[in-house]
Every structure is written in structure tokens, then in C-alpha cells.
Amino acid sequence: CQDMNMKLRFQPVVLSMLFSSMVLVAACSPSKDASNKENASDAQKDLKTAQIKPFPKTADDRHDIDLLIEYDQKFNEMNTALEADLKKMLDEGNLTPELELQRKQDSVRSAQNMLKDLDLKTEQGRYIQGLYYQYWENQAKVYQELKQSTDNELANPTDAIEGMSDYYTAQAQLEHWQQQTAQ
């Protein structure tokens, strides 16, 4: 459980650093200065965790927590395997931008399907599930835009982090719920 708590705290830090650098690049671009400042401000909002919502304790709390943790672990294992596979293909010279994009789109669909398959019994569990799903829905839109782009670039680079607050909020809500249930 301690390993999971550390992972829940570490993952958002890494993601924040990655996406903050994207925001800085977008904000420092010489074109459309006023628009970039607005985009950077919007992006900062997308990186903030919403307040923890209170939910009543139920007999099914442990069940839902375990399912959400299992989902997170399975997704992370799948994502690690995908990254290793992509790296291997890159090293072998077999990775094309189209193939990489397709594999990442497949990963997003898998995350969404895994979430849909969760048999959550509590309001809090379904709330967390919904936050995760909203995040993955946005990622699906980002990859679709990239697929349609002629230069493999997003029209608005900050679109890539839209909805990150949903992901961070889901992680924080789950961690809070775990701590609350452990008491």
C-alpha cells in the first residue's frame, strides 16, 4: 500500500513537469503573444487538482478502492510494456510516426475500456472513474487531432494537457479515500 501511495504522489509530479514544459514552450513562442498568455493561463488551470469531494463511507468502499488500484496498476503495466515496445521498434528502425500514434491511440482506448469494465458500487468510485474517463476522452481527441494533422503537431499545444486536472483530481481523491478507509 505504501508503494502505491508513493506512486500516486510521484506520477503527478512527473506529469506536471512534462506538461509544464509544454506550457512554457507554447507560452514562449513568438507568434500570437496575447493568445499564448491566455493559453498558458488555461493550461495552468488544467494542471490544478480540484478540491477533494466528501462522500459518505459505505460497506463497498474497500471493493471499489481495490478495483481502482487494480485498474491503475494494470494500466501502468500496459503502458510500461507499450513504451518498451516502442523503444525497441525505434532502436530497430521499425517505428514510424503513424505506427507510434496508432499504438498510443490503442492505449487510450484500452484505458477507456478498462474503466468501462469496472463494476464500481459506490458514488465515490464512480466519481473517480468518471474523472479518469474524462481525461482519457480528451487524450483520444488529442491523438485524433494529431492523426489528422499534416505536420504531426497540435494546432494548440496546450490541448495536450486539457483535462489533466481530472486525472490529478482522480488520483488525489483515490489517495484520500484510501487514507480515510484505513482509519
Stretches with model-predicted labels:
Residues 29-31:
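Bacterial signal peptide processing site
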Residues 40-102, 135-183:
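C-terminal amphipathic alpha-helix
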